[in-house]
Amino acid sequence: MTMKKLTSTTTTLWDNKLFINNLKNFMQTNTESNNNKTTAQEWKSFILVVVIALMIRILIIESFVVPTGSMKATILENDRIFGTKYSYGYSNYSLSFFDFIHLFKGRIFARTPERGDIIIFRPPHEMNTRYIKRLIGLPGDKVQLIDDVIYINDEKIERVESGIYVSEEGRKYLKFKETLPNGKTYFSYKLAPVLGIMFNDKYGNTDAFYVPEGEYFFLGDNRDQSNDSRIDLGFVPFENFIAKAQFIWFSTKITWWDSDIGVINLILKLKPWAESIRFNRIFRNLYSIED
């Protein structure tokens, strides 16, 4: 009886131990399986978010940083601008990441741009960069500047002096309100004379430009400091359009990121960069007229 009882007890203990080990193995396997499922789900979610973000950037809206003052004071250096990608349809040059692949010619879902639109495009003479200018001349137009006044098809546009603009650097500009034939109104700027001397006055008087079919004529709002269709830019093909600029979402007087200055200098630069934020420009509509 004793032996049988001992054997029975030993068997029970062994069975319990085996059951516990099996339970541990099952739980461990189940946990690893759940972890793998969780990791897979996290990766799927991450990839989905990235794909959605890329599609938004490619097809709907994209952020652009303006590095120069050719559109001053409508747009200043280091303004961050949102541009809508769908405004004029799509081309190889407007589809981000695909501009090096020639998928098709021309534009799909094309919409006609209007005079006065502020457009981001690839300049024909510098295709690896982006310009931002104001559209003035449409295909078939004759455009000419006489004494700084724009003539479109021999009709003088309305141009009214509207005071003085002083830049952040302290430079003075003459400010003019211009109205295009379609009724769009905006401000243009010309360097104020110093001791009676005008700057770059040769760009205020030009030959007549005849805009070819499928191409457009652009000017910068900062008339004396803009490389536009009067100078090296020339006419811009419709295919080169990237986006229509809409509004400023952020702006600073200085840039912060510079890969050449090192981490410590970036940290030291953070405070002056934050202090240079132009709060009065955040969410500014580029087509609103503010005197």
UniProtKB/Swiss-Prot annotation:
Primary enzyme class: hydrolase
Topology Periplasmic: residue spans: 67-291
GO cellular component: plasma membrane
Sequence intervals crossing the membrane: 46-66
A Pfam cross-reference name: Peptidase_S26
Record-listed E.C. numbers: 3.4.21.89
Cytoplasmic compartment spans: 1-45
Catalytic activity as recorded in UniProt: Cleavage of hydrophobic, N-terminal signal or leader sequences from secreted and periplasmic proteins
Topology in membrane: Single-pass type II membrane protein
Key words, A-Z: Cell inner membrane, Cell membrane, Hydrolase, Membrane, Transmembrane, Transmembrane helix
Compartments (UniProt record): Cell inner membrane
InterPro entries, sorted: LexA/Signal_pep-like_sf (IPR036286), Pept_S26A_signal_pept_1 (IPR000223), Pept_S26A_signal_pept_1_CS (IPR019758), Pept_S26A_signal_pept_1_Lys-AS (IPR019757), Peptidase_S26 (IPR019533)
Record GO terms (molecular function): serine-type endopeptidase activity
GO biological process, one term: signal peptide processing
Active site (record annotation): 70, 133
Family: Belongs to the peptidase S26 family.
Name by which UniProt lists this protein: Signal peptidase I
Gene that specifies this protein: lepB
